[in-house]
Curated annotation (Swiss-Prot):
InterPro entries: AICAR_Tfase_dup_dom_sf, Cytidine_deaminase-like, MGS-like_dom, MGS-like_dom_sf, PurH-like
Pathway: Purine metabolism; IMP biosynthesis via de novo pathway; 5-formamido-1-(5-phospho-D-ribosyl)imidazole-4-carboxamide from 5-amino-1-(5-phospho-D-ribosyl)imidazole-4-carboxamide (10-formyl THF route): step 1/1; Purine metabolism; IMP biosynthesis via de novo pathway; IMP from 5-formamido-1-(5-phospho-D-ribosyl)imidazole-4-carboxamide: step 1/1
Domain MGS-like as annotated: residue spans: 1-146
NCBIfam families in UniProt: PRK00881.1, purH
Gene3D superfamilies: 3.40.140.20, Methylglyoxal synthase-like domain (3.40.50.1380)
Leader sequence residues: none
Presence of keyword Chaperone: no
One of the GO BP terms on file: 'de novo' IMP biosynthetic process
Assigned keywords, A-Z: Hydrolase, Multifunctional enzyme, Purine biosynthesis, Transferase
Name of the protein this chain belongs to: Bifunctional purine biosynthesis protein PurH
GO MF annotations in UniProt: IMP cyclohydrolase activity; phosphoribosylaminoimidazolecarboxamide formyltransferase activity
CDD domains xrefs: IMPCH
Length: 518
């Protein structure tokens, strides 16, 4: 008796050669429905429609096709169980040996920012998950394929003989993972649409890559990624495989460069070009200029030692002039919206340099959550991507600031929230001069930033991610010649810092918003 394969797929990659091999080399009969059946018929592959097999028509505009006892009985019946086989024979139902199903493209559908409610709902598959779960449950008797990537390996095993129980069990596991991911994606989307809250289930993202190791060689690591968003859409043009640390640093780099309009630097010569250098997820240099190579060199001036082995992010296409500057350094990665051909040719001499193309649309469509594991659980929070606009800032000091000072303060404020707390940034004229990161006390971070800036701190501004618990940072800033400070405010000792500014001739802004980063 011929074996039966039930095939119903949304993703038709590899379908025709796979089905031809099943029928011509292995004698399978194929049952299929809808668009899959049409595709097989057009390729002259013998196929029986589900409607012909069940004797029941597709109804409700195709919502009900495979939900029928002749389908699910054939999938769920144990082939070694006499009672099950008796029931099949009595109802004239045949055993189904192979189920090939992948689901309506719900994740792809909702990745469109303009998707309608009705379109999203219509792309929730019902019959597909039911068949997948039925076949996976009865995997001792049925093989279940849910991904075109499985076709070739399955045919190789079929050519070598029967599909082993071990292989069927592995396919069943992958099938349940497939439906679990699908259901989580639906739950997450509906949670946001209906209640504007997080789904209780965190990720529907598949493993994109098993990484060589985690932060250290003794740690295992996997990269989970949405196919149609963010880094899942990034294109690596050159270089070694991305590591865990590369990805962490790239994320920090892009989060920082977005402050200055990712891809905005391509909008014309009048637009600011921005460059960010990251080391261990901290900015070690940030600058803006009307010239990209100048922006990079200004960023590099902030801390050229820490830039060694760092990651560079740019807010516009990398040109040849800037590529020449980059090629003189040892860097792990460069990320930009795109690359000029001459720039790629220059960087091609740096064989290990990872060159990443990340489009503006990839960033725009990406939904980000900040996720950290704790003992027995996971913490999930919104990403800190909201800034208080300058017109909402308050100036509690007697001395006000110039337009130029406000521009420098806004620049420093955009940088400091991407520096690990406690964080201090000293800046002037669109360039970071000193960055104090990750200190256990604020005055310690200020000392690092001010000492790094040195004489350049004279006439510069200082930004702090948190309030000043004491007035010591104001006094230290004054000694280095800082003329204006921006900080959240909110300390019970705010007045002490205000009085110190008034006494020492500094202006200060309270933004009213803290930006801790742990």
């Amino acid at each position: 008796m011929a074996r039966i394969a039930l095939i119903s797929v949304s993703n038709k990659d590899g379908l025709i050669p796979f089905a031809k091999t099943l029928t011509t080399l292995h004698g399978f009969e194929i049952i299929s429905s809808g668009g899959t059946a049409r595709a097989l018929k057009e390729a002259n592959i013998p196929v029986k429609t589900v409607s012909d097999y069940t004797g029941a028509p597709e109804i409700l505009g195709g919502r009900v096709k495979t939900l029928h006892p002749r389908i699910h009985g054939g999938i769920l019946a144990k082939q070694g169980n006499s009672s099950h086989q008796f029931d099949l024979e009595k109802e004239n139902i045949k055993n189904i040996d192979l189920v090939v199903v992948n689901l309506y493209p719900f994740q792809e559908t909702i990745s469109d920012p303009d998707v309608t409610w009705d379109n999203a709902i219509e792309n929730i598959d019902i019959g597909g998950p039911a068949m997948i779960r039925a076949a996976a449950k009865n995997h001792e008797s049925v093989s279940i394929l849910t991904n075109p990537n499985q076709y070739d390996a399955f045919l190789e095993k079929l050519e070598a003989g029967e599909i082993s129980t071990t292989i069927k069990a592995k396919l069943a596991l992958e099938a349940f993972e497939h439906t679990a991911s699908y259901d989580i994606a639906i739950s997450q989307w509906l949670s946001k649409q209906i209640e504007s809250k997080y789904s209780p289930y965190l990720t529907s993202q598949p493993i994109k890559q098993t990484l060589r190791y985690g932060e250290n060689p003794h740690q295992n690591a996997n990269w989970y990624s949405a196919v149609n968003q963010g880094w899942g859409q990034a294109e690596q043009l050159q270089g070694k495989e991305l590591s865990t640390n590369n990805l962490l640093d790239l994320e920090a780099a892009v989060a920082t460069i977005r402050e200055f309009g990712y891809d905005l630097g391509n909008k014309g010569n009048s637009c600011e070009k921005a460059a960010v250098i990251i080391k261990h997820t901290n900015p070690c240099g940030v600058a803006v200029s009307n010239n990209l190579s100048n922006a990079f060199n200004l960023a590099l001036e902030c801390d050229s030692i820490s830039a060694f082995g760092g990651i560079v992010a740019l807010n516009c296409n990398l040109d040849a002039a800037t590529a020449k500057e980059l090629s003189s350094l040892f860097l792990e990665c460069v990320v930009a919206p795109d690359y000029d051909a001459n720039a790629l040719e220059i960087l091609s001499t740096k064989k290990n340099l990872r060159i990443i193309k990340l489009s503006h649309s990839s960033i725009k469509s990406s939904e980000r959550k900040y996720i950290r594991s704790i003992l027995g659980g996971i913490l999930v929070q919104e990403v800190d991507d909201k800034l208080i606009e300058p017109n909402e800032w308050k100036v509690p000091t007697k001395l006000q600031m110039s337009i130029e000072d406000k521009a420098d303060l806004a620049f420093a404020w955009r940088v400091v929230r991407h520096v690990r707390s406690n964080a201090i940034v000293v800046a002037s004229a669109g360039q970071t001069l000193g960055i104090g990161a990750g200190q256990m006390n604020r005055i310690g971070a200020a000392k690092i930033a001010l000492e790094a800036a040195g004489e350049k701190a004279q006439g510069a501004v200082l930004a702090s991610d948190g309030f000043f618990p004491f007035d010591d940072t104001v006094h230290l800033a004054s000694r280095y010649g800082i003329k204006s400070i921006i900080q959240p405010g909110g300390s019970i000792r705010d007045q002490s810092s205000i009085d110190a500014c008034n006494q020492l001739g500094l202006s200060m802004i309270f933004t009213g918003k803290r930006h801790f980063l742990h």
